[in-house]
UniProtKB/Swiss-Prot annotation:
Probably deamidates glutamine residues to glutamate on methyl-accepting chemotaxis receptors (MCPs), playing an important role in chemotaxis. SUPFAM superfamilies: CNF1/YfiH-like putative cysteine hydrolases. CDD domains: CheD (cd16352). The gene is cheD. It is an enzyme of class 3 (hydrolase). This is Probable chemoreceptor glutamine deamidase CheD. Keywords: Chemotaxis, Hydrolase. Belongs to the CheD family. Its EC number is 3.5.1.44.
Amino acid sequence: MSEQDGSPIRKYFLFPGATHVDAEECEITTVLGSCVAVCLWDQRHGGGGMNHFMLPLWNGEGLATPKYGSIAMERLLEQVLAIGARKEHLVAKVFGGANLLSTSSAACPIGERNIELAMTQLEEWRIAVVATDLGGRVGRKIIMNTMTGVVLLGRGKQQNQ
């Protein structure tokens, strides 16, 4: 229930390669493995959103979709600013980037590259990162409240090697 008026909170499931932003209260849920999700929230006025990207960089071929971190990060910031958030009031929370494959090649650590892209972009934008849960060998489920900025985190079980 919404703290403001007792009405049910709207819920949105964020699929990989997507972004969702809301100026009103909404709970955005996603599930992460090697993908990364960045939550941006306006700490002064509320409202915010989340992206969920699978690969770090778009190579210029095909569609420039938010499945690529370089696109997803730009889209998320543009959309959060479009709902009235102010860049100087934004804070970020970053999740995911796990290495779930036991045979994962050191030459292609997708999770690590996704984390690096997100953190570098936020640093360039001078947006403070106030919470992270990154890397490791377990998946995650996160639920972000766009009005309060609270993110609930659940972790999967560690797989035995």
